[in-house]
């Protein structure tokens, strides 16, 4: 579907399915709501899919790989060539995300949405990297829309193949710089308060990063009321691709798990494009990056994991999968009060 067609298919969650899922939880032979957020997230998934029965066995991590022109400003510890190296490691199951996917029984799909050179990673390339946002727009509006629609198309491929749960990941040297820029615009907060050290910058490197972001915002003057303009002016193709996945998941009734800081920026981008889309997103963890908790708060999300992670790739999102499996095992398998011959618990008044 096109971006506009996708937006038009996004509706509120199914209250009927959520009510049935809550009634199912309340009928299980245990204290009411004693599994806390684990109960809430399965009720949310019921609302997303419109079904009381929760099926999340077939799951995928979609990791969007892209390069960012702003690396010209010397804002990263690693060189741009690392993007392609790590992307190819996904295929060889050597990267962190690949190992975690194997452990969590998830399929990993790396996507070249805008790397500076071609690799063996499947190509859905919008361009060979973005332009340097510190000198002008990172991409055109047309490229921004194409990148969003690429994410939508990739997600729809997986949904058509039967995937019931998706997670978003990314790989792209310089993408904490673009993400910090977008976060500063969307949240209307000072750049220094939202910008972290990424993959490990020195204090001097962090100062260059902050200066580059402030310069990019000053030069491009992105309008926070137009999310696609914000993406085009100071964003990245990887962020756009992930946002497309969030939008497609919402349009097709498939839950999508958010990863860390960069994924949260993509989630907020999707929510600014289509507000109901945020109800279809599940937060996994709170990134170590300083803007992470502000982004989650803006989205009205509470994360499960607080591990001071800042690795990216979709690693935190994948770590949530086994937790969801355990919640679903109880939801599906535990005896009801009648089956256990226990008097039904009633809510306190």
Show which residues each predicted segment covers:
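N-terminal loops that bind phosphate or other acidic moieties
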Residues: 2-349
């Amino acid at each position: 579907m096109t971006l506009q067609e996708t937006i038009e298919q996004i509706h509120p969650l199914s209250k009927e399915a959520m009510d049935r899922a809550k009634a199912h939880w309340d009928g299980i032979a245990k204290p009411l709501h004693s599994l806390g957020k684990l109960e809430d997230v399965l009720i949310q998934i019921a609302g997303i899919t419109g079904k009381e029965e929760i099926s999340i066995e077939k799951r995928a991590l979609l990791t969007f790989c892209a390069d960012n022109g702003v690396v010209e400003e010397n804002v990263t510890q690693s060189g741009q060539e690392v993007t392609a190296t790590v992307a190819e490691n996904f295929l060889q199951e050597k990267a962190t995300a690949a190992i975690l996917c194997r452990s969590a029984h998830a399929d990993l799909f790396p996507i070249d949405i805008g790397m500076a050179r071609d690799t063996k990673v499947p190509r859905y390339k919008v361009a060979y990297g973005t332009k340097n946002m510190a000198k002008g727009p990172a991409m055109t509006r047309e490229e921004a829309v194409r990148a969003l629609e690429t994410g939508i198309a990739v997600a729809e491929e997986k949904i058509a193949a039967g995937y019931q749960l998706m997670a978003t990941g990314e790989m792209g040297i310089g993408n904490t710089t673009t993400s910090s820029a977008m976060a500063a615009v969307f949240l209307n907060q000072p750049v220094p308060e939202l910008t972290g050290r990424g993959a490990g910058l020195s204090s001097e490197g962090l100062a260059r990063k902050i200066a580059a972001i402030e310069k990019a915002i000053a030069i491009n003057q992105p309008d926070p009321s137009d999310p696609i303009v914000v993406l085009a002016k100071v964003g990245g193709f990887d962020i756009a691709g992930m946002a497309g996945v969030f939008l497609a998941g919402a349009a097709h009734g498939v839950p999508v798990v958010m990863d860390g800081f960069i994924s949260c920026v993509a989630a907020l981008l999707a929510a600014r494009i289509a507000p109901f889309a945020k109800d279809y997103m599940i937060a996994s963890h709170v990134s170590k990056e300083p803007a992470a908790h502000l982004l989650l708060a803006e989205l009205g999300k509470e994360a499960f994991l607080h591990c001071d992670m800042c690795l990216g790739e979709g690693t935190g999102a994948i770590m949530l999968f086994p937790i969801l499996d355990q919640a679903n095992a109880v939801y599906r398998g535990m005896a009801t009060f009648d089956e256990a011959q226990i008097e039904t618990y009633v809510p306190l008044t």
